[in-house]
Curated annotation (Swiss-Prot):
Protein name: Protein translocase subunit SecA
The species this protein was found in: Thermosynechococcus vestitus (strain NIES-2133 / IAM M-273 / BP-1)
Top-level lineage group: Bacteria
Main subcellular location of this protein, as a coarse class: membrane
Membrane topology, record value: Peripheral membrane protein
InterPro entries found in the cross-reference section: Helicase_ATP-bd, P-loop_NTPase, SecA, SecA_CS, SecA_DEAD, SecA_motor_DEAD, SecA_preprotein_X-link_dom, SecA_SF2_C
Gene3D superfamilies named among the record's database cross-references: Helical scaffold and wing domains of SecA (1.10.3060.10), P-loop containing nucleotide triphosphate hydrolases (3.40.50.300), SecA, preprotein cross-linking domain (3.90.1440.10)
Pfam families: P-loop_SecA (PF21090), SecA_DEAD (PF07517), SecA_PP_bind (PF01043), SecA_SW (PF07516)
Amino acid sequence: MLKALFGDPNQRKVKKYQPLVVEINLLEEQVQALSDSELQAKTAEFRQRLDNGETLDDLLPEAFAVVREASRRVLGMRHFDVQLIGGMILHDGQIAEMKTGEGKTLVATLPAYLNALTGKGVHIVTVNDYLARRDAEWMGQVHRFLGLTVGLIQQQMAPQERQKSYACDITYATNSEIGFDYLRDNMATSMVEVVQRPFNYCIIDEVDSVLIDEARTPLIISGQVERPTEKYLKAAEIARLLKKDEHYEVDEKARNVLMTDEGFIEAEKLLGVSDLYDPQDPWAHYIFNAIKAKELFQRDVNYIVRNGEVVIVDEFTGRVMVGRRWSDGLHQAIEAKEGLEIQNESQTLATITYQNLFLLYPKLAGMTGTAKTEEAEFEKIYKLEVTVVPTNRPSQRRDFPDVVYKTERAKWLAVASECAEVHATGRPVLVGTTSVEKSELLSQLLRELEIPHNLLNAKPENVEREAEIIAQAGRKGAVTISTNMAGRGTDIILGGNADYMARLKVREYFMPRIVMPPSDDPMMLLGLKMDRGGGQGFSQGAQKNWKASPGLFPCEMSKEAEKLLRHAVDVAVKTYGERSLPELQAEDMLAIASEKAPTEDPVIQALRDAFNRIREEYEVVTKKEHEEVVALGGLHVIGTERHESRRIDNQLRGRAGRQGDPGSTRFFLSLEDNLLRIFGGDRIASIMNAMRIDEDMPIESPLLTRSLENAQRKVETYYYDIRKQVFEYDEVMNNQRRAIYAERRRVLEGEDLKDRVLEYAEKTMDDIIAAYVNPDLPPEEWDLEGLVAKVQEFVYLLADLRPEHLAHLSVPEMQAFLHEQVRTAYEQKEAQIEAIQPGLMRQAERFFILQQIDLLWREHLQQMDALRESVGLRGYGQEDPLVEYKREGYELFLDMMVMIRRNVVYSLFQFQPQVAPPPEQVSSSSEQG
């Protein structure tokens, strides 16, 4: 109704971009007339105009026209009008929803080029290394042609290479690499180790998968902490000897223990130490954990012992949580109590969620085939609008209504017979399954029906094999079973993907002769596993096999084509030597050879000539087959279960009917499917029973379809609430993380940190005064002796300070006096240190500040984790757990900042360097502190 009154809001948004499209199209002729070098000179001209005060929006029409022309010359691909609109949506920092096959990858070149003109860097994020590499090589050619630098981040890269790649105008990377690099940069001990520049603009491909499906996944860098095993064992022994209510009290509600004075005396006597809190030999932490293990953690209630390991039991579900460990040394204390082998503690050194990582970008945009269903979440959490880009040609896909069966068995038999029926007509079929086990079950049924098919699931076949299967999934009579449509990077082209087939044929001849044996590959020597499993990659200890499945190719290549191919391989071997290149480098050469970018390299040119010839021969067959398949009705997609999110169902449907091709989809469901069982089961089951239907009879009823959609909405809302909660809690951590990382970066970059340390020292003096002097009490009740002792504990150089020096001063005067004293002492300390080695004091300042920030931040992360766990229970006490978490988390953070200050001041005054070691050793020798 509202749509009829006001028009579709999405259409209004898209309409807004129309005048710009007209403007770009008017520029087309003019830009086409430019020579290559004139076109390339445009980049410098645009940069100049930005310097002269024009904005990116002013440049947009001309810049887009230039990219469109460059892409036409280099890749032979010209942006459609709808792709220009997609580019504008991305430039405006929104999410562009574009259907499968509408060329998302090409769209990103437009805003990436425009935003890279500022020189601040653009990140294009994909979901896996293979897609990042493919896009950097393929689309990167347009940017390189226009004079921009293009970087690529891959899993095994060394820091120097990463630094170089991040310094480029446009960098392609995966979400996890960007996240881990961000965390590592914030653990660096000098600016030389920092690889990333400040974030500027980011385009996320498959944005729903990164910002929604993986939003709850934290990225964690952790380190093993070596702690002395014998301390845990000794502490367990002491805890056994201490008596409850005499030596300690147990607070069951807070799950904590408090030691009495008698307890401290007894424990110190048993251990033969004078102070449990002695920083040189700390025992308190171990003793407290040992008492907790004895009193609060019971075997077979809180944990079980299985195969010599302590396994946690979840108190809410009663399930064992394999692989989870209590933190803070508690797990070790329980291992000691049970007399088991004590394992190392692991400690979180740094962590961030994708939600917060991407919110660090001043401007963020994304593309996907399916975002509209999650629009509310994108807007609420990421402030990102979703705009649907119209398709270039109207869709001809038919979505048939769902068919529901009573049992799972009946459903699978129906799926198999549908495959057989459609296969008999010659139409290609794609079946999406939700698990490996189900895909193998269907494969078995199809084998019994003698239907040839390809199986694609998460078994360790590598990405290349996956893309190979998808590349031929559109051929006449092809049947493909795929789990969760993992190969989202390659399009299903009706009649077969000639381009991809030709590339695989070149690969068969080229790779065996040029790739070095695995034992010589530098990646292997470094002990780095290549991130590709078996299949066509190396599986451990196996011989590499480059041959594609023989059925893949549509026809034999001609003698002339084979001659060209053998010649190209000979040229490569002559240039580089037999079996001399690492696999990645050879893959890169192949990728560049199969694109259209101009090249000077004779090897690539020879490979390209062969590739083009083979592709042309294959195209004769695939084009004819394309027409046949279109006439038959295109690809038929079968879904075998509804996913937890409608979005993933839509991704599967979107495989059919791409770019205006015909196609159809249908979902087969059963009452035993997870989604229906968990979220809608009883209501639907009662409908079914009321209908008294045989199990092999399908049901199609509007009532049932509605119940299904409600079940799906329920699941979506449930997961959205979880993500929102994770986000709200993590928001607290995020503000703290930003503050501490900003402080850390200031220290890393700061040339002169002396003023900062003096400020720390003055604040520490103020803290000491506040602890010993209550301005509301008369001066004779002030504990000046304690105050002076505490000051001298921090600053031994003030040994001459006496209580009488402070006796007649007011609090502000006392502060001013101690500020002056501590400054003088610091100058004195500096003179001592500089006499040993000039410049050493500055290094020491940086080292101690970074060391304390890192050390206390790690501990703070653990405290925040513990707080988050305990705060959940406050809900029962009518308190809002989130409000409590924010309040207490903030207090913990302030405490940490104070501790950092005090420890730095203490460490610097205590610092006694040995006689002139080389400067590097100063920082590494105290690294453990």
